[in-house]
């Protein structure tokens, strides 16, 4: 495993060095640029590492014991029939609070999301369900993800490159990690009331502004007209 730190000011570096003493397989990428945020941080680290398969991990996630083996088994079944294709395997998550109390046992179910219905670029670009810390992807998927534009989240970028290249995204409808939702998340889930229609109606101005800002970003990826965006957003 490879670790990078984005410029922590607490005792994170000390914790990392303690892990290095415990396991010589861990590599600390200390020389990578700092204070660049999650998307550039993950992509920058990906660019430096050569492997057959890749997985991302956030520092406060709790991986369930079956996470790696389940993802690898599903990947291997796909790879046997598609040895040259970019492949992404990803899973559902359970959302928990700071003390690991469950807020959502299935994030997909809570959001009424069926990833298998969203596997084309027009949908995926506006509803990127492939969460980075659940993904396992191969070197072919890495290869087509560079050069990186620098303007999009790492999981969105890799997943949309795979779809655009006619690769394969496979969804596993089993939570494989506990996603910790707390006040210090750089990026967090919306859960409960914030996913409900009445909440969005009551906060319609924010919803519209958020969607307009998001459209401006994906337009840079040649998404198409705002009418197309609205059509796929409401379908």
Predicted features along the sequence, with ranges:
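Nucleotide-sugar donor-binding/catalytic module of glycosyltransferases
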Residues: 1-191
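Surface-exposed helix-capping loop/turn segments at secondary-structure junctions
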Residues: 81, 215-224
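Alpha-helical interaction segments
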Residues: 53-54, 205, 221-222
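Catalytic core of nucleotide-sugar-dependent glycosyltransferases
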Residues: 110, 179-219
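Membrane-interface aromatic/basic loop that binds lipid-linked glycans or pyrophosphate carriers
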Residues: 220-235
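Intrinsically disordered, low-complexity segments enriched in small/polar residues
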Residues: 52, 177, 212-213, 230
